[in-house]
Amino acid sequence: MNKHVFFDNLTASIGAMVAGKKKFFSKSIQSPSFEEQVAAVELELPSLNGEGIYEVRAKTLVGDLDPAFRVAQWKGNEYPTIIYHHGNNERPFNFKKSAKNTFYNIFINTKNAIEANLIVVRAPFHNCTLKQYQESMLDLSNFTAMIATSVRLNEKIIKEIRKESTKPIITTGISLGGWVTNLHRGIFNSSTAYAPIMAGTFLGELFLKSKYRKMASDIALDNLEEIRRILNFDEVFKRRNSQNVFPLLSKYDQFIEYAVQSESYTGYPLKTIECGHVTGAINTKALRDHFDSVLEAIGR
């Protein structure tokens, strides 16, 4: 067993132990589809006034939710914009070296400044404690609403930027944020480019086939086809054939399994790194290099 596989397996085992009986979807596996969830989200952006944190109130099928976004760097309308979606249980507004924050590690905590506007979106249920987050994820409809709300917020941000700028916009995200990225493309496809990191379109398989299934409830594992019907969105993604996807997967990822999720990207320039899920998320050089290459590919 190589180190990449080891750390993924260890992470899943510890996560399952901490979750105990409160595993994903242990209360309910009933949920509208992603498309139904996205269509139902109602939200308005606050007035944008430069860099800072912008709280948003979203009306959804599961009630009012609390997404937000941070304009971390604004260089001007003559620059491209990167909209980033964080991973599971990250704290994307916590700009400290000790924080669980891939956005900060890739774009902020570096000597290599990026010539782009930087916006990071905070998904619903990520402005609370781990315990509160776990409670919310007992219900599958909360999980799908969380992703759908980030998708809708991403679209609102793009429309706002387009009012003043014709420069490229890249929608991107890692793990949880990668699913948001791909779902946005499938439904809206309004971003110039998409850079999903360690994600695909077969989201149901994460909970049913990968090592991460340790985090799934018995009720989910006993209802495979229902989970697949709700969470896999490969057919939605396939509706788009524009060559604007620049994915990255980790070869040894035990959660976002390469053999499964790479099927999402047939015909697209898939970048592969020699990592697992955990080791890939902390390989900030490889991730940053990928973003730089995407900027080059779209001509900044």
State where each predicted segment sits.
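Short, flexible, mixed-charge acidic loops at enzyme active sites
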Residues: 128-137, 209-212
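N-terminal targeting or regulatory segments adjacent to alpha/beta-hydrolase or S9 domains
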Residues: 1-54
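Alpha/beta-hydrolase active-site loop
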Residues: 132-164
